[in-house]
Amino acid sequence: MTASTSSIRKAVVLVLLAGATACGGSFYEVPVETPLQPKLDVSGFQRVLVAGFVSGGSDEVDTNLETARLLRRPLRSNSEFQVIDADVLELTSVAEEQSAGRPEFEALGGNGDNGADAANGDEEEGGERYSEDDLEILEHIFANASYWQEIGEEYQQPLIVTGTVYFTPHQRSGMVTRQREVYDEFGRRRVAPLRAYRDRRGYVLSPKFIFIDGRTGATLYTERHREEVLYDASRNTPALSSYFELMDRLIPSFLSTLSAETIKGTRMLLK
């Protein structure tokens, strides 16, 4: 629905309500709940294994370990799954081993040390493990059904959550609008927009969540996300804090893939 269509509908509702009130009618609110089914049918699974992730970008955060940890927590409290408590797989190393000898992987030098941010050209002190494009070369591990079937057999054939995670510093410069308090000659306060050129720095988080059937090793569903956060260049925000902030935005969408949701609202009815 476009913004203009939504505005028209709201205007029509207000006109109808005004007309009903003028004619002596009245209206009242009733609660409404809209159920939303999960994106993936997981009725055949009772257990879930957040196995690990192929990671790239900055090495300031162990995104493999932290992503697995942050996804397990809401699954325990907001789903009916039995979450398997297992060591997180070093999936980047496994993907590298399975990629050995492939021309496209050997072209990377076999170690992913590119030393530059492919997204914006920023150079970081510690370099970059793998760029976002490099991670695609390692994604063939998710098509290795026998590998995932073996993992599934080890953990009683659960639903397996895996994928890739790319987390990297990011910067952008440009005009930004801020609100500023001003007072006129009579002392009256008002808020005025102020546009200024600012350098901003932050991080980009781009995970791809892949859901695999532990019984067959086949991929059931893939979901990609991308979030970024920017701060004033003068603000020193730790990488881990930014990572947590970005993951908080993604987790609700991740959970909606596996669990039913209910959207609550109200509806106006005429008597």
Model-identified regions with their sequence ranges:
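Sec-dependent bacterial lipoprotein signal peptides
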Residues: 1-23
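Short hydrophobic/aromatic-rich motifs at helix boundaries and adjacent loops
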Residues: 7-10, 40-45, 120-121
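Short alpha-helical segments and helix-capping/turn motifs at coil-helix boundaries
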Residues: 6-7, 33-35, 145-147
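A generic structural signal for short, solvent-exposed coil/turn residues
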Residues: 12-15, 40-42, 75, 197
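C-terminal/domain-edge helix-coil "capping" segments
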Residues: 23-46, 151-155, 167-271
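N-terminal segment of the mature soluble domain
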Residues: 47-169, 214, 218, 222, ...
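Low-complexity, intrinsically disordered/propeptide-like segments
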Residues: 17-20, 43, 68
